[in-house]
């Protein structure tokens, strides 16, 4: 009987081949920061607080009928200046990479650390804006999907009874127009979760972005339009549990969709510590804390704040979703 030698008998000589083509990893779709009013804080300004100003709304209360010729009005219209303050907070993150890892690595961990640090900074900044809009802002406009009475009713309802309907976002547009909210490029902007977007796309009046992209430039992440609102998807939506209205819950079933016009909210823009284009520091070399140069440290820092500037200029729509 012939003896045949195959790979199974000498399998210990074979080693794994490692592909140097890295697989893609999940990167969140972020939308809110691009529509914020950005306020610079110059270096050596003597403050850690940014203050936005606005004059009071137009009013006819001081206009008088002048019954007698040559007689001036008896009263005067007073101007008042309102302000909104935001205290900046410093944030930071570091990634330490050992010399042994760098000596034996298949991939450049320093290069990847720089890349992921920038993505982490952008994600963190967007979450700060999201949490500000979803917080208990005085005077915020809210709407409930499917004609439900209030947030508690949305929380108690089934998904089918709390899903967004065709006319729900018309109410958002109407509310903003009633408040004289300035538009952004002739439309309002809506930022929704992918699940709510799925529900919206099934409504009869939905207009896909592809149908008007030839004549209008699209925002990053834009998916379509309805009732004068251009919708964008975010994968980091504000979720809540149906009982605690203004508290983010990653496993919450109530989705907050934000519809807004111009200057609804603002963020700081400190050139040297901005999370949008952060300065990433790579520290290498022996020091008192690392005398043998055993670590390379990659990190960033930001000095940042987000604030609602005019609560009348945005609407938070609460809903559930049929997506499962």
Segments from the language model and where they lie:
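Short acidic, glycine/tyrosine-flanked loop/strand segments centered on an H-E-D-like triad
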Residues: 77-105, 277
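Short, solvent-exposed loop/turn segments at the edges of secondary structure
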Residues: 88-90, 185, 293
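N-terminal "assembly arms/tails" that initiate or stabilize quaternary assembly
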Residues: 1-86, 318
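Alpha-helical scaffold segments that mediate packing/assembly in large oligomeric complexes
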Residues: 101-178, 195, 324
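Short, low-complexity, charged/polar segments at coil/turn and helix-coil boundaries
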Residues: 24-62, 134, 163-214
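Beta-strand elements of well-folded, non-transmembrane domains
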Residues: 56, 99, 302-306
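Sequence/fold signature of self-assembling virion shell proteins
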Residues: 2-33, 151-173, 197-324
């Amino acid at each position: 009987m012939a003896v045949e030698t195959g790979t199974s008998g000498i399998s210990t000589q074979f080693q794994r081949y490692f592909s140097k083509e890295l697989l893609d990893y999940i990167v969140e779709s972020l939308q809110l920061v691009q529509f914020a009013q950005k306020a610079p804080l110059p270096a050596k300004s003597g403050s850690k607080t940014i203050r936005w100003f606005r004059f009071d709304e137009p009013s006819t209360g001081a206009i008088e009928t002048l019954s007698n010729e040559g007689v001036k009005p008896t009263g005067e219209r007073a101007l008042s200046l309102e302000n909104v303050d935001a205290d900046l907070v410093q944030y930071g993150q570091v990634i330490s990479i050992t010399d042994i890892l760098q000596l034996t690595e298949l991939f450049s961990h320093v290069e990847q650390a720089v890349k992921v640090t920038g993505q982490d900074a952008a994600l963190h900044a967007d979450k700060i804006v999201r949490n500000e809009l979803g917080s208990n802002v005085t005077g915020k406009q809210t709407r409930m999907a499917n004609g439900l009475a209030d947030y508690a009713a949305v929380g108690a309802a089934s998904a089918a009874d709390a899903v967004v309907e065709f006319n729900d976002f018309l109410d958002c547009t109407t509310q903003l127009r009633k408040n004289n909210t300035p538009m952004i490029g002739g439309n309002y902007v809506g930022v929704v979760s992918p699940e709510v977007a799925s529900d919206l796309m099934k409504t009869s009046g939905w207009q896909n972005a592809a149908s008007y992209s030839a004549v209008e430039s699209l925002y990053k992440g834009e998916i379509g339009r309805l009732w004068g609102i251009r919708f964008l998807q975010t994968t980091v939506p504000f979720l809540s549990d149906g009982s605690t209205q203004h508290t983010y819950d990653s496993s919450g079933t109530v989705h907050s969709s934000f519809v807004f016009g111009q200057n609804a909210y603002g963020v700081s823009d400190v050139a040297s510590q901005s999370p949008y284009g952060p300065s990433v520091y790579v520290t290498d070399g022996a020091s008192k804390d690392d005398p043998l140069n055993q670590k390379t440290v990659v990190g960033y820092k930001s000095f940042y704040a987000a604030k609602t500037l005019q609560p009348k200029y945005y609407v938070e729509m609460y809903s559930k979703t049929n997506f499962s």
